[in-house]
């Protein structure tokens, strides 16, 4: 098989990326029921630099503009005492010696606050964005990169993990956990559960108190019961082929996410054009 050497995202050492070949198809009990050939779309060039660029652009374009109120820190009646009093010439509340409103005073306005007019997004060429997505898709078929990203799974599994369409008919989370355990990937969900911690900084007061590691990426052909049964497990993302992008395939710009795909979803992905 053709081989190409590339640099890892977070390490100086080199890894060998091979051309993907045949993959096993697993049932809900983890048994191999057949083989399938990985689509040609998985054999595109692996470019970690473009993957990072694509993820950065996607995340930047998600940002919402923010700014303080235009009148923040200025809701006072103030005046200055002027010179000759032996005190600083700052604005003070009327009838009081308390300084106010100036940026250097407690409770005053900010000197140069963020503006809602500022464009926080980043531009990227369409072809470059597509190349980043396909490169991240290619990385999911490389066991070396998946392991380097920290995912835990049975050594005998072929990646990406292809499962029969019966997976989409699972009706409960309990059944989903049993299936993931049988296939040999539930250890990665446990890694996400054990890695849950309280976020450092102000974010924990703003609706994002906990930081949870990214675990399995589940790709289903359509909105289904199977997808709903696993999406509440820590670290798991459930998407359809149309919703795949570089950000979900390589969270944080680190390629090699552990991916579980139904047979129907794989057929849809195989129909993509480069």
Report each predicted region and the residues it spans:
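Structural motif
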Residues: 159-161, 215-218, 236-237, 257-259
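Nucleotide-binding motor/catalytic cores of P-loop/tubulin-like NTPases across gene-expression machines
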Residues: 225-248
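Phospho-regulatory, Ser/Thr- and acidic-rich intrinsically disordered linkers and terminal tails
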Residues: 118-119, 183-186, 197, 204-208, ...
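Short His-Asn-centered micro-motif
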Residues: 163-166, 219-222, 241, 261-262
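Short, solvent-exposed amphipathic alpha-helical segments in soluble enzyme
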Residues: 177-182, 231-236, 254-255, 274
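Intrinsically disordered, compositionally biased charged tails
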Residues: 1-26, 32, 273-274
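Basic, glycine/proline-rich low-complexity segments that contact nucleic acids
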Residues: 28-213
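Solvent-exposed alpha-helices and their adjacent loops that cap or buttress functional pockets
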Residues: 16, 153-156, 208-212, 231, ...
């Amino acid at each position: 098989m053709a081989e190409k050497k590339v640099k890892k995202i977070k390490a100086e050492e080199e890894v060998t990326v091979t051309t993907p070949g045949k993959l096993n198809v697993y049932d809900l009990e983890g048994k191999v029921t057949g083989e399938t050939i990985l689509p040609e779309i998985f054999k595109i060039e692996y470019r970690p630099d473009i993957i990072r660029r694509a993820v950065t652009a996607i995340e930047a374009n998600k940002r919402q503009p923010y700014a303080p109120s235009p009148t923040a820190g200025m809701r006072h009646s103030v005046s200055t005492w002027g010179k000759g009093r032996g005190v600083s010439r700052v604005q003070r509340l009327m009838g009081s010696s308390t300084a106010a409103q100036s940026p250097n005073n407690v409770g005053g306005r900010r000197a140069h606050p963020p503006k809602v007019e500022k464009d926080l997004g980043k531009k990227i060429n369409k072809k470059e964005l597509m190349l980043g997505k396909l490169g991240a898709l290619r990385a999911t078929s490389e066991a070396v990169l998946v392991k380097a990203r920290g995912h835990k799974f049975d050594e005998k599994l072929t990646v990406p993990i292809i499962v029969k369409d019966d997976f989409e008919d699972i009706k409960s989370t309990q059944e989903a956990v049993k299936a993931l355990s049988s296939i040999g990937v539930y250890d990665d969900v446990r890694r996400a559960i054990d890695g849950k911690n309280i976020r450092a900084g102000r974010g924990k007061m703003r609706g994002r108190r906990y930081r949870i590691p990214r675990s399995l990426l589940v790709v289903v052909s359509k909105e289904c019961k199977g997808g709903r049964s696993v999406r509440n497990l820590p670290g798991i993302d459930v998407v359809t082929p149309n919703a795949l992008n570089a950000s979900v395939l390589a969270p944080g710009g680190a390629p090699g996410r552990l991916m579980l795909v139904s047979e129907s979803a794989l057929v849809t992905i195989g129909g993509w054009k480069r």
